[in-house]
Amino acid sequence: MNIEQARLYAMSLPGTAEAPHHKYSSFRVGGKIYATVPPDGLHLHVFVDEVEREHALALAPEACQKLFWGDAAVGLRIVLAKAKPASVKRLLHCAWTRKAPKKSVAAHPNPMQQA
C-alpha cells in the first residue's frame, strides 16, 4: 500500500477533508483529526482505540507500531510498504468512526471489519 491509495480511501469516507497539520497532512471529519501523514509519506498515523491498536499489533507487528503522544499511546504508526491494503482501510475506517458524527457512522458501516 502507498500513501496515495490510503489518501483515496480516507477521502472516500463521508465528511473527510485533508488539511495541513504542522509539517504533516491530516485527515479530518467535523474538524477532528483521525489520521495524519508524516512528511516522509512512507507512514500513516491512525488514531484508533486501544482494542483496535492491540489487535493490529498482534496481527501485523511488522507493519504496525504504537504511536505515542508523550507517554500515552494514542494510536498506530503504520509502515505502508509492509501493510496489507485491507488492514489499512479497516484501521482508517475505525479511526474515522471515532471522530465522525453518529449519523454518518450508522450510514457508512465498515465493509472490511474482519479484514
Predicted regions and their residues:
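Charge-dense, helix-prone N-terminal extensions
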Residues: 1-115
